A protein has these predicted regions:
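Catalytic Cys-His active-site segments of thiol-dependent hydrolases/isopeptidases
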Residues: 344-359
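Acidic, histidine-bearing metal-coordination/catalytic regions of metal-dependent phosphoesterases
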Residues: 1-138, 156-173, 180-247, 282, ...
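Active-site environment of divalent metal-dependent phosphoester hydrolases
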Residues: 118-120, 147-150, 177-184, 264-267, ...
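Short, conserved loop/helix-junction motifs that constitute active-site signature segments
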Residues: 163-167, 315-318, 340-343
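Short, flexible/disordered intra-domain loops and linkers
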Residues: 184-192, 297-307, 363
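Active-site-proximal segments of metal-dependent phosphoesterases and phosphodiesterases across multiple
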Residues: 263-273, 277-323, 422-425, 434-459
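Short acidic-hydrophobic surface loop/beta-edge motif
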Residues: 247-251, 333-341
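Active-site neighborhood of phospho(di)ester-bond hydrolases with catalytic His/Asp-centered motifs
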Residues: 111-113, 137-144, 148, 168-176, ...
Length: 515
C-alpha cells in the first residue's frame, strides 16, 4: 500500500495517531467496536428521509429531470441583484491573509461536504472537525448546506448552531438542495443579499413543459426584510465577505476557486467566463465544485453553457490546477488522474461525508477510468464496510432486526474482494470466510456483480439514514505552503474515542509548481 501511494498518489502520510489506527488497520479503527458512543453523536434534531415531507420538499430535483433546469436563469437574477446593490466584479475574489511561518506563506482550511441535516449524524462530525481543524484559517462547506430544501429558517439549527465553536470564517458552495428554494436561504445567510428585492423571473413560459414545471415547482415564501431570520457569524474574524454562490479565495500560496453547479445543468455563460478568466492567473489552484468531476468510477466533465467543460479548464496546463474537489455524493473518493506533461497526477476528490446519509461505496464498480485503476483508487468507507453497514440498515428496515440480513465486516470484505477481484483493506480481512447465510444476504443486497449504481440501491440509500456508530462520515484538512499542498481525509465514526483524535483515512502531498 505504501509504495503504491508513494508512486501514483503522491507521498503517503503517517497513520492516524489513534491507538486503533484507521479503518485500514482494524475494526476498532473503523468504528465497529466503539468503546463508547460519542457525545456529539447523540445530539441534534431528528431528521429522516423516511418522512415523506422532506421528499416532497425536495421534489424540484425530479422536476428538473422531467422539465429542465432553471438554475442558470435564477443565478443570473441573483448576480444582477447583487450588482444593483453595489457589488463589484472584483468582489468575487476574497483575499484571505496567509500566515507566515519561518518567512514562508502558509494557509490551512477545512472542507466538509453535504452537512445540513441538523441531526446526530451531522453533529458527530463537529467535535472531530474542531479537534483536527480549530486552528485553520477558514472552512468551506461544499454542497448541500441545508436539507431538505435550503430554507432560510433552517440555518440556525443546521448551520449556525453546529459550527458555533469554529472560530474562523465559513464559506460555502450551494448544492442542489440549497437551490430547491431558489437559493433564497443561501443568498440571505451566506452572501448578505437583500432577498426581498429579488425580481420574479421575466417572461411567460415558452412551452407546455415550462408551464407545467412552474406550476409544480416548490417556491420559497415571499418575505419582507422584517420577516427574515437574523444573520449570524457577522462579527470581525468570522465574517467572510462572500457575495456570490461562486467565488475565489486568494490565500497567498494557493487560489481556491469555487463554482456553483446548481441542480445539474450546464454552468451558465457568465460564470463560465469568470471561471476561465480567474483560471488564467499564475497561482496554483484547487477547484471546489458542488458536484464532483470523477465519481463512482465515472468521469463527469460538466458542460458549460457557452461550450467546453469545467474539466477542460482544470486540465489546461496553463491554469495550474492541482486538485478538483466536489461534494454531492456522501462519501470520500480519490482519483489520481495522470495528465500528460505533468510530473504529478491531478487529484480528483469526492468529499461529501459531512453529515448526510452515507452513499454506499460497495456500489462503485472496479475502477478503470481516466487512467486510474483500482490499485490507484481510494475510498472511504471501504467497500466491505459499506456492504456490512448497508446490510444492517436493510435488516433493521426490512428484516425486522432479526439479523437475517446482517453481514459481518470481515465477511462483507471477503465478498467484495471475490466480486470485484480486489484485495481487502484490513490485514484481518485477508483470510475472510463467507458463510452461506451471509452469502445469501449479500447476493440479495447486491444483486448485480460489479454494478454499483442501480436505481434500486439509490432509492433505498436516501431512505436509510443512520445515526448510530459507525457513521463513516469524513472531512478534509488542506494545508498549503509555497512548496506543497497537503490534503488529509479524517473520519468521524461517532465513537467517543475518535472524537478528540479522528482517524486519518487518506493523505496526499502535492508539490507545487509556479508558472
Amino acid at each position: 500500500m505504501a509504495s503504491r501511494e508513494e508512486t501514483r498518489n503522491g507521498t503517503a502520510g503517517p497513520r492516524s495517531r489513534t491507538s486503533a489506527g484507521s479503518s485500514r488497520d482494524s475494526l476498532a479503527g473503523a468504528g465497529w467496536r466503539c468503546e463508547e458512543v460519542g457525545v456529539s453523536a447523540s445530539g441534534g434534531r431528528p431528521f429522516s428521509w423516511m418522512n415523506p415531507v422532506p421528499l416532497w420538499q425536495s421534489r424540484n430535483q425530479n422536476l428538473v429531470r422531467l422539465f429542465g433546469d432553471p438554475t442558470n436563469e435564477e443565478r443570473r437574477l441573483w448576480m444582477k441583484l447583487q450588482r444593483e446593490a453595489g457589488w463589484l466584479p472584483e468582489d468575487l475574489i476574497v483575499r484571505v491573509p496567509p500566515r507566515r511561518e519561518a518567512g514562508r506563506q502558509k494557509v490551512s482550511f477545512i472542507l466538509v461536504g453535504d452537512t445540513g441535516e441538523g441531526d446526530a449524524s451531522q453533529r458527530a462530525v463537529v467535535k472531530p472537525l474542531l479537534a483536527g481543524g480549530r486552528d485553520t484559517d477558514f472552512m468551506v462547506v461544499c454542497s448541500d448546506v441545508i436539507y431538505p430544501a435550503g430554507d432560510a429558517g433552517d440555518y440556525d439549527a443546521k448551520f449556525y448552531e453546529p459550527y458555533d465553536d469554529y472560530p474562523s470564517p465559513i464559506y460555502a458552495l450551494p448544492g442542489n438542495h440549497d437551490w430547491y428554494d431558489g437559493l433564497v436561504g443561501f443568498m440571505h445567510h451566506l452572501c448578505g443579499a437583500d432577498v426581498s428585492a429579488l425580481p420574479a423571473a421575466e417572461g411567460r413560459p415558452s412551452s407546455f413543459k415550462e408551464r407545467l414545471r412552474r406550476l409544480l415547482w416548490r417556491r420559497p415564501a415571499r418575505r419582507g426584510p422584517e420577516d427574515l431570520p437574523v444573520r449570524r457569524r457577522t462579527e470581525e474574524g468570522r465574517r467572510t465577505g462572500q457575495r456570490s454562490p461562486y467565488f475565489a479565495l486568494d490565500t497567498g500560496p494557493l487560489l481556491v476557486v469555487g463554482i456553483d453547479t446548481g441542480m445539474g445543468g450546464p454552468i451558465d455563460r457568465e460564470q463560465a467566463g469568470w471561471l476561465r478568466g480567474i483560471s488564467r492567473t499564475d497561482k496554483p489552484k484547487v477547484l471546489l465544485t458542488g458536484k464532483p468531476l470523477y465519481v463512482d468510477g465515472e468521469h463527469h466533465p460538466y458542460p458549460m453553457e457557452d461550450g467546453g467543460t469545467v474539466d477542460d479548464v482544470v486540465l489546461d496546463p496553463n491554469h495550474n490546477y492541482v486538485a478538483a474537489i466536489g461534494g454531492d455524493i456522501h462519501n470520500y473518493q480519490r482519483y489520481p488522474v495522470p495528465v500528460g506533461g505533468r510530473d504529478e497526477p491531478l487529484q480528483y476528490i469526492v468529499s461529501g461525508g459531512g453529515g448526510a446519509y452515507m452513499s454506499a461505496t460497495h456500489r462503485i464498480p472496479k475502477v478503470d477510468v481516466g487512467g486510474v485503476t483500482e490499485d490507484d483508487f481510494i475510498c472511504y468507507p471501504r467497500r466491505g464496510d459499506s456492504l456490512s453497514f448497508y446490510s444492517k440498515l436493510y435488516d433493521r428496515r426490512l428484516g425486522l432486526g432479526m439479523g437475517w440480513l446482517e453481514i459481518a465486516p470481515g465477511e462483507a470484505a471477503a465478498y467484495m474482494a471475490e466480486r470485484l477481484g480486489i484485495k481487502p483493506a484490513r490485514p484481518e480481512d485477508h483470510e475472510g470466510y463467507i458463510g452461506k447465510r451471509a452469502r445469501r444476504a449479500a447476493d440479495w443486497i447486491f444483486p448485480l456483480p460489479g454494478s454499483g449504481r442501480t436505481h434500486y440501491h439509490h432509492f433505498f440509500s436516501e431512505f436509510f439514514d443512520w445515526n448510530d456508530p459507525p457513521l463513516f462520515k469524513n472531512f478534509l484538512r488542506i494545508d498549503a505552503s509555497e512548496s506543497e499542498v497537503r490534503i488529509r481525509c479524517f473520519a468521524a465514526t461517532g465513537c467517543a474515542e475518535h472524537e478528540d483524535d479522528p482517524p486519518l483515512e487518506d493523505e496526499v502531498r502535492i508539490p507545487l509548481q509556479r508558472k
